[in-house]
């Protein structure tokens, strides 16, 4: 638990430095089922216990439509943390692979997944979406943009989505993969 406490301290610092959470916010964590999003969920759950700006926490998973995905462990973790959990069923897999037959599906899939998340959240009045991007992801995005696009670019700690009114927040930007690997789920 000590590693989670130290990690939560980094998350808190990032949240405060970029004013990511306001009193009364409901923060939805986009949970893929991978370690990054699960650790973020755990850290924000811990943070809400003592953070001076009270906020509610929810978890949401976009089901892309692939067979064999089991989100039971995610549901169990959410229940143990007292966090409401929603599974959003989509046909993203069908659109990306069967209709569009994308050769490089990652970008389209990511955009569609974020669009589905933001639309679902704005329909419920939730204006904050926490994503599990960390420092190493930011560096990788910066380098890929430089090499493949010839420009200096990276995602921001807070990104406002004008169409839906949802703010995407990235509270783990002060922590890298090495710090994440110390936390046991």
Please state what every model-predicted region is.
Residues 1-143, 148-151, 178-179:
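ATP-dependent adenylation/nucleotidyltransferase module used to activate substrates
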Residues 154-175:
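Short, flexible loop segments at boundaries between secondary-structure elements
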Residues 183-185:
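Conserved small/polar residues in nucleotide/adenosyl-binding loops
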């Amino acid at each position: 638990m000590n590693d989670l406490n130290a990690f939560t301290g980094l998350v808190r610092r990032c949240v405060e430095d970029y004013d990511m959470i306001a009193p009364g916010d409901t923060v939805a964590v986009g949970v893929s089922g991978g370690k990054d999003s699960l650790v973020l969920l755990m850290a924000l759950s811990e943070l809400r216990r003592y953070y001076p700006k009270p906020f509610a926490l929810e978890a949401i998973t976009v089901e892309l439509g692939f067979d064999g995905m089991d989100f039971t462990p995610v549901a169990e973790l959410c229940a143990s943390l007292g966090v409401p959990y929603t599974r959003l069923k989509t046909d993203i897999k069908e659109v990306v692979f069967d209709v569009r037959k994308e050769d490089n599906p990652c970008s389209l899939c990511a955009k569609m997944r974020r669009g589905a998340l933001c639309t679902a959240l704005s329909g419920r009045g939730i204006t904050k979406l926490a994503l599990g991007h960390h420092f190493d992801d930011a560096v990788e995005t910066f380098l890929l943009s430089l090499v493949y696009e010839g420009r200096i670019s990276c995602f921001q700690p807070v990104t406002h989505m004008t169409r839906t009114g949802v703010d995407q927040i990235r509270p783990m930007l002060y922590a890298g993969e090495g710090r994440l690997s110390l936390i046991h789920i």
